[in-house]
Design a protein with these regions (language model features):
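Intrinsically disordered, low-complexity regulatory regions
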Residues: 1-142
Length: 142
């Protein structure tokens, strides 16, 4: 019952389905294009157009393979969380295998997947999964 409640809370934000439920965000600034069209500047919104479609394709295929291997939570097993140390260990292992020339798996996509998973949990402020050591430089310790 408690897990069902958590799923319902998680999905509550996704239940909006009518345009009447949303406002259009407005930063106030406008760019005027030669044809007369107006649009907000892109600064600070990210440059999705710079993400390599090849890298994104490999990463998406890795997500697909993972969803088949771990079908729990409708293939979104990883979103349920695990310690960052587990993701980090796997990312480093896959990078090392790539550096050693191993080609049995897409080791770069696997490493990227693990790093993306950590970033996802960071953005959601899921600090309970952050079990990584907190190192400090000697100059910071003094």
């Amino acid at each position: 019952l408690q897990s069902q409640r958590k799923r319902e809370e998680k999905n509550e934000g996704m239940m909006k389905c009518s345009l009447n439920d949303f406002d259009i965000a407005d930063g106030g600034d406008r760019l005027n294009y030669d044809g007369g069209a107006l649009r907000e500047p892109m600064t600070g919104k990210g440059r999705y157009d710079l993400i390599s479609p090849f890298a994104l394709d490999r990463l998406a295929k890795w997500y697909e393979k993972g969803s088949k291997k771990y079908p729990q939570n409708n293939g979104r097993n990883w979103e349920m969380g695990m310690p960052f140390s587990r993701y980090m260990d796997s990312a480093k292992r896959h990078l090392n295998k790539f550096l050693m020339g191993e080609t049995d798996e897409d080791h770069l996509a696997a490493a990227a997947w693990n790093i993306f998973a950590i970033m996802h949990h960071q953005e959601r402020h899921e600090t309970r999964w952050d079990d990584l050591p907190k190192y400090k430089k000697m100059e910071d310790v003094r």
